[in-house]
Amino acid sequence: MNILMLTFIICGLLTQVTKGSFEPQKCWKNNIGHCRRRCLDTERYILLCRNKLSCCISLIISQEYTRRPAFPVIHLEDITFDYSDVDSFTGSPVSMLNDLITFDTTKFGETMTPETNTPETTMPPPETTTPETTMPPSETATSETMPPPSQRALTHN
């Protein structure tokens, strides 16, 4: 009796194990592909599965796979806008702020004078340049010590 019960238990466990290992493996999105060594003529290779198997997806779309639902159609007649608060909108992301106020700047640029409320533009002071600053120091040193190429050719002969 014990051997018979042990046999039934082993047979029951074997059926559970064989379902996982001998069934063809599924792959891709929503398990629509099958892992095979070589894809059939009606299938296309997409990517690799485990153990060097190819994920093959059928070229013929079957009805057993659920498709993505279509987007709902939006009718423009159904869209309405509420224009009741248009007058109170100031153009600022924060409510009740006035965008017409400008602040005095300490840097060079445009500032508002409080007496006349007119913008004034100030320019930065001009930078004075001298001949020493316009030429790089490496060029001035080499031009005084090295003769021009035509004179160099004459001196080496």
Swiss-Prot record:
InterPro entries in the cross-refs: Beta-defensin, Beta_defensin_dom
Keywords: Antibiotic, Antimicrobial, Defensin, Disulfide bond, Secreted, Signal
Pfam families, sorted: Defensin_beta_2
Residue span of region Disordered: 109-157
GO biological process, alphabetically ordered: defense response to Gram-negative bacterium; innate immune response
Disulfide bridge partners, by residue number: C27-C55, C35-C49, C39-C56
Annotated Gene3D superfamilies: Antimicrobial Peptide, Beta-defensin 2, Chain A
Keyword Disulfide bond: yes
Signal sequence region: 1-20
Keyword GTP-binding found: no
Gene Ontology cellular-component terms listed: extracellular region
Biased composition regions of type Low complexity, renumbered to the chain: 110-121, 129-145
Places the protein is found: Secreted
Entry's family note: Belongs to the beta-defensin family.
Function noted in UniProt: Has antibacterial activity.
The name this protein goes by in its record: Beta-defensin 125
